[in-house]
Swiss-Prot record:
<comment type="function">
    <text>GTP hydrolase that promotes the GTP-dependent binding of aminoacyl-tRNA to the A-site of ribosomes during protein biosynthesis.</text>
</comment>
<dbReference type="InterPro" id="IPR009000">
    <property type="entry name" value="Transl_B-barrel_sf"/>
</dbReference>
<feature type="region of interest" description="G2">
    <location>
        <begin position="58"/>
        <end position="62"/>
    </location>
</feature>
<dbReference type="InterPro" id="IPR009001">
    <property type="entry name" value="Transl_elong_EF1A/Init_IF2_C"/>
</dbReference>
<keyword id="KW-0342">GTP-binding</keyword>
<comment type="subunit">
    <text>Monomer.</text>
</comment>
<feature type="region of interest" description="G5">
    <location>
        <begin position="172"/>
        <end position="174"/>
    </location>
</feature>
<dbReference type="GO" id="GO:0003924">
    <property type="term" value="F:GTPase activity"/>
</dbReference>
<feature type="binding site">
    <location>
        <begin position="79"/>
        <end position="83"/>
    </location>
    <ligand>
        <name>GTP</name>
    </ligand>
</feature>
<keyword id="KW-0460">Magnesium</keyword>
<protein>
    <recommendedName>
        <fullName>Elongation factor Tu</fullName>
        <ecNumber>3.6.5.3</ecNumber>
    </recommendedName>
</protein>
<dbReference type="InterPro" id="IPR004160">
    <property type="entry name" value="Transl_elong_EFTu/EF1A_C"/>
</dbReference>
<dbReference type="Pfam" id="PF03144">
    <property type="entry name" value="GTP_EFTU_D2"/>
</dbReference>
<feature type="binding site">
    <location>
        <begin position="15"/>
        <end position="22"/>
    </location>
    <ligand>
        <name>GTP</name>
    </ligand>
</feature>
<feature type="binding site">
    <location>
        <begin position="134"/>
        <end position="137"/>
    </location>
    <ligand>
        <name>GTP</name>
    </ligand>
</feature>
<dbReference type="Pfam" id="PF00009">
    <property type="entry name" value="GTP_EFTU"/>
</dbReference>
<dbReference type="GO" id="GO:0005525">
    <property type="term" value="F:GTP binding"/>
</dbReference>
Length: 393
């Protein structure tokens, strides 16, 4: 990390429609700007609510991005206006979340989308959740608030979060926006920020074991075989041992060179587009769609469970439903592999616009890990998007 840059955390607001996610997002920027000017600036409700549409993996999603910072950290915060946008955002990973702020209205308590968002957060690997009970200004009865809090803690525990240990802050985003910066409701916003400050920083991609997906393979006369691609995580140095995983039997080799923009380097790291020279490997021994990895860090599998979102017709998806044993292509990292979908028991068919859990059996083994995102394609177009929730042996 460059000197002077604050550690960075990705945050997202989740919760039922109209419980106040967008108002809270506006209140966070407003209170922090009043209290700790710095790089903070007020972002109003309307600016967040009319979020621009973005395309991620062929899917259109409306997402608002705001940022704010504290003395010690920088936060990138994502808020989606519509429920469908949340589902799509979380499954495609268009905006990653290290921590989610669960917003629950004190007047309603937990609602169906509250549950759905918590489940999805767990499925897509959001490690931490902090909770904001909103609209507390309109609930006179302290006991009512305690019941809502208890209910939310129980719900979080049911979905595998630490319901007893999670920070729950009671406040009113609207009141915090209306009052002066040292008022009691603004203090509640600062209490929520304090809960975010306690979240452990995520492990940076650079500090994880090396992995790179192969995009292309070249033969350089006199030097050997070079594979190119973007380094997904970790660092590779000249002399490191690497495994070639997926599509075929595992091969082990050594990196004899790292190149970027035709310059020889000693190392390549997460985020770099690099060429890796491999010892004793012929051009025909390796192909697009395999991965290079630190020894023993990833294996290839043919089956997994996943959470998927199936595009609507208006999004360029299918016009008709599909049934169990539907066989599309799964675009995983840099390769398309045919596979068949098994629907959960009790689900007869899947309509465009649905999201659900499925099991997939691939025709060929591919390097897979939990949390990996993929596209579902048919005839060259994206018809769905998913994330692996469990690897099946």
């Amino acid at each position: 990390m460059t000197e002077g840059r604050k550690p960075h955390i990705n945050v997202g607001t989740i919760g039922h429609v109209d419980h106040g996610k967008t108002t809270l997002t506006a209140a966070l920027t407003t209170v922090l700007t009043r209290r700790l000017s710095g790089a903070n600036k007020v972002v109003k409700y309307d600016e967040i609510d009319k979020a621009p549409e973005e395309r991620a993996r062929g899917i259109t999603i409306s997402t608002a991005h705001v940022e704010y910072e504290t003395e010690g950290r920088h936060y990138a915060h994502v808020d989606c206006p519509g429920h469908a946008d949340y589902i799509k955002n979380m499954i495609t990973g268009a905006a990653q979340m290290d921590v989610a702020i669960l917003v629950v209205s004190a007047t309603d308590g937990a609602m169906p989308q509250t549950r759905e968002h918590i489940l999805l957060a767990k499925q897509v690997g959001v490690k931490d959740i902090v909770t904001w009970i909103n609209k507390c200004d309109v609930v006179e009865d302290e006991e009512m608030l305690s019941i809502v809090e208890m209910e939310v803690r129980e719900l979080l525990s049911n979905y595998g979060y630490d319901g007893d240990g999670v920070d729950v802050v009671r406040g009113s985003a609207v009141k915090a926006l209306e009052e002066s910066s040292d008022g009691p409701w603004s203090e509640k916003i600062m209490e929520l920020v304090g809960a975010l400050e306690k979240i452990e920083l995520p492990v940076r991609e650079k500090d994880k074991p090396f992995l790179m997906s192969v995009e292309d393979v070249f033969s350089i006369p006199g030097r050997g075989t070079v594979v190119t691609g973007r380094i997904e995580r970790g660092v590779i140095k000249v002399g490191d041992k690497v495994d070639i995983v997926g599509l075929r039997d595992l091969q082990s080799t050594v990196c004899t060179g790292v190149e970027m923009f035709h310059k020889a380097l000693e190392t390549g790291e997460a985020g770099d587009n690099a060429g890796i020279l491999l010892r004793g490997i012929k051009k025909e021994d390796v192909e697009r769609g395999q991965v290079l990895s630190a020894p023993g860090q990833i294996r290839s599998y043919k089956a997994f469970k996943a959470e998927v979102y199936i595009l609507k017709k208006e999004e360029g998806g299918r016009h008709t439903p599909f049934f169990s044993n539907y066989q599309p292509q799964f675009y995983v990292r840099t390769t398309d592999v045919t596979g068949s979908i098994k629907l959960p028991s009790g689900v007869e068919m899947v309509m465009p616009g649905d999201n659900l859990s499925i099991e997939v059996a691939l025709d060929k083994p591919v390097a897979l890990d939990k949390g990996l995102r993929f596209a579902v394609r048919e005839g060259g177009r994206t018809v769905g998007s998913g994330i692996i929730t469990e690897i099946l042996e």
